[in-house]
Amino acid sequence: MNRLAVTDANIFIDLIILGLIEHLFGLDIEIHTTREVFDQLTARQKEILTVFYADGRLTVYDFSWEELAEIFTLDFPAGLEPADRTVFYYARQLACLVISGDNKLRKHCEKKGLEVHGLIWVFDQIVALELIRKTIAVEKLEKLMSYNDRLPADEILKRLKKWSAK
């Protein structure tokens, strides 16, 4: 595994809700996040992720005071949460992929030349690697659409149609 990704809280939360979090760690990607992101999670979500942290599949990075000071001197779009700023900074330091469900963070990463993908991309990878059956992916995407209206409905509908085809 040599590809790295820094992940935000939205990705973890949605995958935990959908019961698919273990599949994120089944991708051929080394998953990282920041302490600031980890601290946004509920106690139950942290407990679930601690299993992956304990076995080395999740890296939670703790910034030094100097790094935190530098992060807060950087120019970010208005309204970008401090935890999301740490995702950008850490990914830039690692020169790696960002996996995020936050539109402001995604746009900032793209503007600054970082590769960035979201939850739909994660689904694509999970299905391509056959970590779940397409029928299960369809069920999970339908559930996702029932509570998360921030996702691109057109992209989800394409996958629902493609993965439902016999």
Q: Model-derived features: where do they sit?
A:
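Acidic, PIN/NYN-like endoribonuclease modules and their adjacent C-terminal/linker elements
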Residues: 45, 106-166
